[in-house]
């Protein structure tokens, strides 16, 4: 049965995926009983990620949150199967959120999430079919860039995605006397996590505006930071702690959530959940609070930036240990002129870039001209004999990775990931794309 919001199974998909159909439908936000397609979709996603599958009120809560995000789902099914009665073999979600390209500068981005393929159907082209179809759809909608976070680092480059931001997992030794390099100001107030329902999103949006590389948050964070997941203690809370920083005038400027890991641990530890600061003073005050928690000897944080600000907050930077560093945000440019016109610049410059793109969206030779903080990108046709002479040749994955300025084009040249036709061109591109603030993605999706 084809519902009004379905995309009917298409014969071209069956040509690529024999015996399979592709369906597309929105996350309505309705309970599972009213939207069994989405209930089965979410169940498949959780199983394919080896997660616990929610049911009852917990499942309905997740469905409602995904509806608030405006997600559109794609599922690959056995031929002629009804998505309301069959589990999808492949899953994919896409939705639009703002990408911060500079301070107070945003572009709408196509966010990709919940991409899975059942283990029994690997290497049949299911992922490629879903990804290419949805990137085509994003282009048709006029979205200049796509974004995702990758469960595996070797999957998405083939589709033109490049790493644009990184994050660290850190441990802070708080035993003994810990001091900050500069005194904190304002005050810290402990609050019930549920008090963050309104305050949290407002502060996040203010921090977002100052953080190139971050994206608008998904609705699930309002539940995570208020400790109200129905799958855990029926939404009544599980011991999450929350603290809000107020400046000297009493205005909230930031907040942090954290959880004690238990007295059975050899070293008494708290794990930071979410830390949002809209000012440098707020960031300093929140860490002043965390490193001076009574009885605690270690603070763990799984979403630390690469900028080493945390180390510089402390008089003893060796108290901070990085236990893991990994890629966070992957970007994929879909419209070269729109993407580069949609970010700020700190200097003037001009470069000719020859871009290869296996999907064709960004392919071509482009002149990037920046004057007075504004970029204009024009196509020059094919490079090579008789055509435009590029300064650099690179794949769209590399172009997407360096786009925000958090990844160096010069380092990619040294790694052999791009080709320089004019000496110094990679360093020029690095300088031209330098960000106005450290590039970091504050959130997952």
Regions found by a protein language model. Give the residues of each.
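Intrinsically disordered, low-complexity, positively biased terminal segments
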Residues: 1-39, 50-53, 187-445
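Active-site rim helix/loop that mediates acceptor-substrate recognition in acyltransferases
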Residues: 49-101, 215-240
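Conserved beta-strand in the GNAT
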Residues: 75, 83-97, 111, 116, ...
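A short, polar/charged loop-to-alpha-helix boundary motif
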Residues: 98-105, 172, 262-270
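Conserved acetyl-CoA binding element of GNAT-fold acetyltransferases
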Residues: 106-119, 265-277
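Conserved acetyl-CoA-binding loop-helix of GNAT-fold acetyltransferases
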Residues: 114-117, 122-139, 279-291
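Conserved active-site alpha-helix within GNAT-family acetyltransferase domains
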Residues: 139-144, 150-169, 306-322
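Flexible glycine-/small-residue-enriched beta->alpha junction loops
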Residues: 163-195
């Amino acid at each position: 049965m084809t519902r009004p919001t379905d995309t009917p199974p298409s014969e071209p998909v069956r040509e690529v995926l024999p015996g399979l159909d592709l369906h597309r439908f929105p996350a309505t936000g309705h309970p599972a009983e009213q939207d069994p397609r989405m209930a089965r979709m979410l169940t498949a996603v959780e199983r394919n990620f080896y997660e616990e599958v929610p049911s009852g009120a917990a499942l309905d809560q997740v469905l409602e949150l995904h509806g608030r995000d405006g997600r559109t789902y794609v599922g690959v099914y056995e031929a002629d199967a009804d998505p309301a009665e069959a589990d999808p073999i492949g899953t994919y979600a896409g939705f639009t959120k703002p990408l911060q390209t500079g301070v107070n500068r945003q572009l709408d981005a196509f966010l990709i999430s919940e991409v899975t393929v059942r283990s029994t159907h690997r290497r049949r082209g299911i992922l490629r079919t879903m990804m290419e179809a949805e990137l085509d759809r994003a282009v048709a909608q006029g979205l200049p860039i796509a974004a995702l976070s990758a469960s595996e680092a070797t999957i998405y480059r083939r589709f033109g995605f490049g790493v644009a931001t990184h994050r660290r997992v850190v441990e802070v030794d708080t035993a003994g006397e810990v001091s900050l390099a500069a005194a904190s100001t304002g005050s810290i107030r402990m609050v019930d996590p549920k008090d963050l329902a309104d305050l949290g999103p407002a502060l996040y949006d203010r921090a977002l505006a100052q953080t190139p590389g971050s994206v608008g948050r998904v609705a699930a964070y309002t539940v995570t930071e208020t400790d109200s997941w129905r799958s855990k203690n029926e939404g009544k809370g599980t011991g999450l702690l929350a603290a809000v920083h107020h400046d000297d005038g009493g205005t909230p400027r930031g907040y942090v959530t954290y959880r004690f890991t238990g007295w059975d641990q050899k070293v008494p530890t708290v794990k930071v959940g979410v830390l949002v600061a809209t000012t440098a003073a707020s960031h300093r005050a929140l860490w002043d609070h965390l490193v001076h928690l009574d009885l605690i000897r270690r603070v763990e944080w799984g979403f630390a930036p690469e900028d080493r600000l945390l180390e510089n907050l402390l008089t003893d930077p060796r108290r901070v240990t990085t236990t893991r560093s990994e890629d966070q945000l992957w970007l994929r440019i879909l419209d070269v002129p729109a993407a580069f016109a949609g970010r700020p610049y700190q200097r003037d410059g001009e470069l000719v870039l020859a871009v290869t793109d296996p999907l064709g969206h960004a392919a071509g030779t482009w002149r990037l001209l920046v004057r007075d903080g504004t970029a204009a990108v024009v196509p020059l046709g094919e490079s090579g004999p008789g055509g435009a002479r590029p300064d650099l040749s690179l794949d769209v994955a590399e172009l997407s990775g360096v786009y925000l300025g958090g990844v160096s084009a010069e380092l990619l040249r040294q790694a052999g990931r791009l080709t320089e036709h004019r000496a110094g061109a990679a360093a020029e591109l690095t300088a031209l794309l330098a960000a106005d603030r450290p590039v970091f993605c504050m959130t997952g999706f």
